[in-house]
């Protein structure tokens, strides 16, 4: 495999960027013309002494905004750990540098738009969870890497990366098109990685979780649900648990993703908007596309649908069950488990019902395992695909339980655990295990819903606590605010970053300029004024109590009526995406 360079210096002159590879023995320099935007390969001797020099950790890519092209570089990284001798890094800080020396050629409106687009790019970059490795392919599971051809293994990291999980693929299009430049860049995944040295029975082993978020149908909680026409599911995450001991290694893979047919749940100021199933689309076609690709990549599928089997979630569960049954595909099995009903009144021990119900299937699927001499001992023949409404809180709890069961078998087979010993009895490791899975839940939740996960007290401690309920309430309030009043901007940021929307410098007006209806401006003002007057009348009583009551009732009714009108027209008051028209299923 052609590794990427690991250390760089960026030399900037008014005319060009010179990105110097600083690895031992390297003589290559990537030259970017700031006027023509052309990229070429040169040598160290071509770097002019007049340039301003700074060290950088890597090239994220380039993006076109209103002012022209911008170079995105990684300026700070933090070591996560070593994966089979390869250092895994977390990208911590970035810099977005304009090719143009000035933006004075722009109009005031263009300057404002460019500033907004820059804020969007930085919004995504500041979302925690970007990881990379310069000499190892993080986009693939252990099993996929094991089953590759010699030709595949000779490819550069950019050529061989799984496009589903390469979040800077759009930003690197120009570099990818020139193979001689491939060593100057690497795939960056988005999600979560934790690597922990652990010890049981005096035997030290490495335990790892890698969660890879798909960049297909990527987005935020309420604006991206279901699937697209290609069968890509919203909030699709591949989670791989890896254990290494004495050069032997094993991995267990699970997936999560939105219920894979066409439905939506647009924010409308209500705490829980009603999900709507599309009446005008071919659900079976989309469902088949989704599961055909899943079976091709992962083998047999066991769907664990954890949504409520009552209320607004019931139609989704019924439709999903009916569609899977209609497929008549022997590689796909459907299991519905009403998580909230089964675990109501703090009865979290009832999760074991589901774990026991799928135990035979988990035994059948197995896991990928390689002996210390490199021989493949077993492969994973199927995958559990878990989902709830968001594929976050309930999903993560179930995934952690299934992963523990797989790990129990792997550690016994490797000789770390004695026969009859259970992971749950190893207090030190159990604490590491639970906290890591809770951290995984928080990372996935922040990236999709904007806050940490719910129910992480159970993941961390093995039991539900009253403090955990309080924190869930707080996170739910934060989610409500973000989902209604800031997620449109967050969705636009992701669409711009991934190339779902491309800025055209020749456009005089961008989609950012959407005129708001008069109701959007006037009604909130009326409501605030009416409510304020109601409070003032309560505090400053009139001459008689009847006069005071009349004023309070008048202003109270005015504020209540205005609030009702706002709620009825809720979708006009939420922060909606502007750049890419999202499907409306209603």
From Swiss-Prot:
Topology, Cytoplasmic side: 1-519, 569-586
EC assignment: 3.1.3.64
Transmembrane segments: 520-540, 548-568
Localization in the cell: Endoplasmic reticulum membrane; Golgi apparatus membrane
Ranges of the Lumenal topological domain: 541-547
Keyword Transmembrane: yes
Xref: InterPro entries: SAC_dom
Essential for phosphatidylinositol-4-phosphate phosphatase activity: annotated segments: 451-586
Entry's Gene Ontology BP terms: phosphatidylinositol dephosphorylation
PROSITE patterns (UniProt xref): SAC
Ranges in a coiled coil: none
Reaction catalysis annotation: a 1,2-diacyl-sn-glycero-3-phospho-(1D-myo-inositol-3-phosphate) + H2O = a 1,2-diacyl-sn-glycero-3-phospho-(1D-myo-inositol) + phosphate; a 1,2-diacyl-sn-glycero-3-phospho-(1D-myo-inositol 4-phosphate) + H2O = a 1,2-diacyl-sn-glycero-3-phospho-(1D-myo-inositol) + phosphate
MF (Gene Ontology): phosphatase activity; phosphatidylinositol-3-phosphate phosphatase activity; phosphatidylinositol-4-phosphate phosphatase activity
Keyword line: Endoplasmic reticulum, Golgi apparatus, Hydrolase, Membrane, Transmembrane, Transmembrane helix
Membrane topology, from the record: Multi-pass membrane protein
Gene, per the UniProt record: sacm1la
Occurrences of domain SAC (ranges): 121-450
Native source organism of the sequence: Danio rerio
Name used for this protein in its record: Phosphatidylinositol-3-phosphatase SAC1-A
């Amino acid at each position: 495999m052609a590794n990427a360079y690991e250390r760089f210096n960026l030399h900037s002159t008014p005319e060009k960027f010179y990105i110097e590879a600083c690895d031992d023995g390297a003589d290559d320099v990537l030259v970017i013309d700031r006027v023509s935007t052309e990229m070429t390969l040169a040598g160290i001797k071509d770097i002019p002494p007049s340039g301003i020099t700074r060290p950088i950790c890597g090239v994220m890519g380039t993006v076109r905004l209103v002012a022209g092209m911008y170079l995105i570089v990684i300026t700070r990284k933090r070591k996560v750990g070593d994966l089979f001798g390869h250092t895994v890094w977390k990208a911590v800080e970035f810099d977005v540098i304009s090719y143009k020396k000035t933006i004075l050629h722009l109009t005031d409106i263009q300057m404002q738009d460019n500033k907004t687009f820059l804020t969007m790019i930085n919004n995504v970059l500041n979302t925690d969870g970007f990881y990379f490795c310069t000499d190892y392919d993080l986009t693939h599971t252990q099993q996929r890497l094991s089953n590759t051809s010699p030709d595949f293994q000779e490819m550069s990291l950019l050529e061989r990366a799984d496009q589903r999980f390469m979040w800077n693929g759009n930003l690197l299009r120009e570099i990818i098109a020139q193979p001689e430049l491939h060593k100057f860049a690497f795939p960056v995944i988005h999600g979560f990685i934790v690597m922990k040295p652990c010890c049981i029975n005096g035997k030290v082993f490495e335990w790892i979780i890698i969660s890879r978020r798909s960049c297909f149908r990527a987005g935020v909680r309420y604006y991206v649900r279901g699937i697209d026409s290609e069968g890509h599911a919203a909030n699709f995450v591949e989670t791989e648990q890896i254990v290494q001991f004495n050069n032997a290694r094993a991995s267990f893979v699970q997936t999560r993703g939105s219920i894979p047919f066409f439905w939506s749940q647009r924010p409308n100021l209500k705490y829980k908007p009603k999900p709507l199933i599309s009446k005008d689309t071919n659900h079976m076609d989309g469902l088949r596309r989704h599961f055909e690709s899943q079976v091709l990549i992962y083998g047999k599928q066991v769907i664990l649908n954890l949504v409520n089997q009552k209320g607004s979630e019931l139609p989704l569960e019924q439709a999903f069950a009916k569609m899977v049954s209609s497929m008549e595909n022997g590689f796909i099995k459907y299991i519905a488990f009403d998580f909230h009903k089964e675990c109501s009144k703090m009865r979290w021990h009832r999760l074991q019902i589901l774990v026991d119900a799928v135990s035979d299937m988990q035994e059948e699927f197995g896991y990928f395992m390689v002996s210390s001499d490199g021989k493949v001992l077993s492969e994973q023949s199927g995958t559990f695909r878990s989902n709830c409404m968001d594929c976050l809180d309930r999903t993560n709890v179930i995934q952690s339980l299934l992963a523990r069961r797989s790990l129990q078998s792997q550690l016994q087979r490797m000789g770390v655990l004695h026969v009859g010993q259970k992971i749950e009895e190893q207090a030190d490791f159990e604490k590491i295990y639970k906290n890591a899975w809770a951290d995984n839940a928080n990372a996935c939740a922040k990236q999709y819903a904007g806050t940490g996960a719910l129910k992480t007290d159970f993941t961390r401690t093995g039991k539900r606590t009253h403090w955990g309920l309080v924190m869930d309430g707080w996170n739910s309030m934060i989610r409500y605010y973000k989902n209604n009043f800031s997620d449109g901007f967050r969705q636009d940021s992701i669409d711009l970053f991934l190339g779902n929307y491309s800025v055209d410098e020749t456009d005089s007006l961008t989609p950012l300029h959407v005129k708001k209806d008069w109701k959007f401006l006037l009604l909130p003002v009326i409501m605030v004024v009416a409510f304020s007057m109601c409070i003032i009348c309560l505090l400053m009583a009139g001459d008689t109590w009847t006069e005071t009551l009349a004023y309070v009732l008048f202003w109270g009714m005015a504020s209540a009526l205005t609030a009702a009108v706002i709620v009825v027209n809720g979708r006009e008051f939420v922060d909606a995406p502007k750049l890419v028209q999202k499907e409306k299923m209603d």
